[in-house]
């Protein structure tokens, strides 16, 4: 699919333009500079034509900190790979040295560029005071738009499509491929989620720095591994609710993380092996389990653990004790930074997804039920007649009983264990239970 990149200095309205073109609020929009840190992408569909649109972080002329430096580095690398660039400038304030510096880079990169003047609600003032100086950037006639007020966006999209087709790119809409495994990478801030994301993709796509909170928008990427399609999503770090101020960028980011979990098939829960398992790690795992998503747990930064060769059993025991509610998850010890065991993470994702989509025959369930009930004492008066699997993603089982009121948590634990031990292990997948009264 053709790729169109939105670039520009901070706060010229790139994310607002992105949201309007993809027709959904996907990129975070705030008045604060530098809100978008990781590239955010989605598909634009226009009268049977489609292309991928990518919103990038604002490019600072002279980045003053490691995050800004990384933001600029990621954006400049993506410019070189794009089919077309939308260079967005402020149509109210005119051009600055930052605009001129970015324009110089775009010209040297020899990438096809459309100059977009945003915030041109007052078109007459724009044409009189700002438009003449835009020609000096070297990209010809600018397209004036107001992303916030949906002005001239149709002209912009039609220009994009014409430019892409002139390059011989195929923009015809194709049926959506739905067989991709959707994987969300989640965890506390600074546990190495973006490093793992980049290690899987074998390229720097998400920002990586030692400063917690570097990732704000979920970053997604399609990738084929051994002929299988995946969509990986790197998410922002989740802190405790009490530590997150309301109506802030971080609060919006947390909503996006939960949304990414709900859209995923498999969630990779990343832990920092140098810090063990915290209460917040448990909360995140509980969120994944309650949302009914398959899961893989990874202890990252294993290379930094002292005497690690002798401590696998210790950490495995810790996992079983603290993550008892998701102890069906494969546990992998990795170093994302050094590339250790990344292949095992992929294998675990495949295993979890296979479990998540498995459906077992009713005969196997009821055979196991009869066998185990022969030597099991149920609560007085409770009878379990038979069961069947009624759904996948997650595997969901319906049991017919004489009294739903007598089904308490111990009976649910018993039935899940019966299924895993005697029918199918469902490694990496939660099991949901439903009950129906029967005589």
Swiss-Prot record:
GO biological process: ribosome biogenesis
Every EngA-type G domain range: 2-168, 181-357
Family annotation (PROSITE patterns): G_ENGA (PS51712)
Signal sequence segment: none
Keyword Cell inner membrane annotated: no
Keyword Cell membrane assigned: no
Domain KH-like: start-end pairs: 358-439
UniProt-listed InterPro entries: G_ENGA, GTP-bd, GTPase_Der, KH_dom-like, KH_dom-like_a/b, P-loop_NTPase, Small_GTP-bd
Matches recorded under Pfam families: KH_dom-like, MMR_HSR1
Binding site for GTP 2: 187-194, 234-238, 300-303
Family label: Belongs to the TRAFAC class TrmE-Era-EngA-EngB-Septin-like GTPase superfamily. EngA (Der) GTPase family.
UniProt cross-references to NCBIfam families, sorted A to Z: GTPase_EngA (TIGR03594), small_GTP (TIGR00231)
Quaternary structure annotation from Swiss-Prot or TrEMBL: Associates with the 50S ribosomal subunit.
Protein name: GTPase Der
Organism listed in the record: Thermotoga petrophila (strain ATCC BAA-488 / DSM 13995 / JCM 10881 / RKU-1)
């Amino acid at each position: 699919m053709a790729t169109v990149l939105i670039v520009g200095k901070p706060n010229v309205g790139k994310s607002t333009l992105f949201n309007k073109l993809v027709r959904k609020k996907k990129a975070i929009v705030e008045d604060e500079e530098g809100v978008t840190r990781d590239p955010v992408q989605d598909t634009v569909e226009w009268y049977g034509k489609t292309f991928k649109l990518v919103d990038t972080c604002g490019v600072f002329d002279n980045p003053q900190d490691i995050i800004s430096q990384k933001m600029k580095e990621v954006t400049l690398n993506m410019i070189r790979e794009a089919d077309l660039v939308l260079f967005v400038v402020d149509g109210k304030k005119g051009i600055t040295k930052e605009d001129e510096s970015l324009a110089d880079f775009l010209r040297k990169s020899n990438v096809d560029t459309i100059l977009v003047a945003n915030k041109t609600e007052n078109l007459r003032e724009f044409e009189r005071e700002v438009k003449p100086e835009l020609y000096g950037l070297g990209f010809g006639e600018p397209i004036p738009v107001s992303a916030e007020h949906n002005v001239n966006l149709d002209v912009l999209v039609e220009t994009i499509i014409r430019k892409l087709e002139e390059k011989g790119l195929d923009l015809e809409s194709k049926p959506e491929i739905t067989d991709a495994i959707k994987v969300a990478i989640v965890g506390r801030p600074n546990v190495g989620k973006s490093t793992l994301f980049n290690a899987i993709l074998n390229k720097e796509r998400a920002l990586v720095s030692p400063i917690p909170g570097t990732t704000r928008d979920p970053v997604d990427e399609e990738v084929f591994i051994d002929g299988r399609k995946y969509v990986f999503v790197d998410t922002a770090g989740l802190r405790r609710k009490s530590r997150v101020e309301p109506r802030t960028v971080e609060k919006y980011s947390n909503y996006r993380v939960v949304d990414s979990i709900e859209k995923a098939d498999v969630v990779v829960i990343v832990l920092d092996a140098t810090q063990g398992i915290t209460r917040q790690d448990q909360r995140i795992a509980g969120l994944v389990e309650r949302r009914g998503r398959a899961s893989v747990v990874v202890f990252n930064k294993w290379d930094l653990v002292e005497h690690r060769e002798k401590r696998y059993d210790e950490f495995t025991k810790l996992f079983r004790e603290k993550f008892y509610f998701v102890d069906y998850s494969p546990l992998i010890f990795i170093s994302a930074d050094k590339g250790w065991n990344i292949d095992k993470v992929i294998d675990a994702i495949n295993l979890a997804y296979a479990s998540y989509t498995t459906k077992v025959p009713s005969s196997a369930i009821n055979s196991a039920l009869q066998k185990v009930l022969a030597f099991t004492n149920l609560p007085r008066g409770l009878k379990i007649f038979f069961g069947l699997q009624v759904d996948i993603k997650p595997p969901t089982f319906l049991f017919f009983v004489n009294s739903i009121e007598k089904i308490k948590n111990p009976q649910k634990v018993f039935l899940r264990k019966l299924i895993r031990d005697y029918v199918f292990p469902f490694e990496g997948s939660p099991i949901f239970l439903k009950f129906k009264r029967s005589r």
